[in-house]
Amino acid sequence: LMEVFPTHHILSEESGDHGCSNSEFQWIIDPLDGTTNYLHHHPQYAISIALLHQGQLKQAVIFAPEKNELYVASRGEGAFVNERRLRVSKRNVLSECLVGTGFPVVNQKITPIYLSILQDMMRATAGVRREGAASLDLCQVARGRFDGYFEFNLKPWDIAAVSYTHLRAHETR
């Protein structure tokens, strides 16, 4: 990207900040979301890319190579997976909702809080699922397969592309 857009700013999980920090354009990239899954040959991993212009999300792409799923969201166009429009769930009663989650990095302060919330969610919802790649779990919310998602300490590269995808999917609800 730096060769094609030398005046843009890039924030990447793996390589940090690059380019012009005051650029109108910023790319937020997670080149491998679900690293542990990838290393264990589990298909739940993805590449996630978001483009911001003047601080506003404009384009998002999430690709799950093993599943051959390409999620694309564009302002004014909506959100799609492999050219099929995404629509979020209409469920709004918590006891009927299927919720996704991710486990935070083990931390003596956060782990007990997370486990308490997880226990409450397991009691209050139709079920909780953990698949190991935040971007793809959140894509399940955009698809209407999950009704919500919670996780602690997510970073911009974990959620930038998928949050935009979710917003565009919500527009077509």
Segments (PLM) and residue ranges:
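Acidic beta-strand-loop-alpha-helix segment within the catalytic core
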Residues: 49-138
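Flexible, acidic active-site loops/lids enriched in D/E/S/T/G that coordinate Mg2+ and/or position polar
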Residues: 1-54, 61
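Alpha-to-beta junction loops
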Residues: 143-148
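Acidic, divalent-metal-coordinating active-site segment for phosphoryl/phosphodiester hydrolysis
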Residues: 160-163
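Residue-level signal for inorganic ion chemistry
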Residues: 1, 35, 64, 73, ...
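Conserved small/polar residues in nucleotide/adenosyl-binding loops
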Residues: 165-172
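Short secondary-structure boundary segments
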Residues: 14, 103, 152-154
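Acidic donor-binding loop at a coil-to-helix junction in glycosyltransferase catalytic cores
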Residues: 157
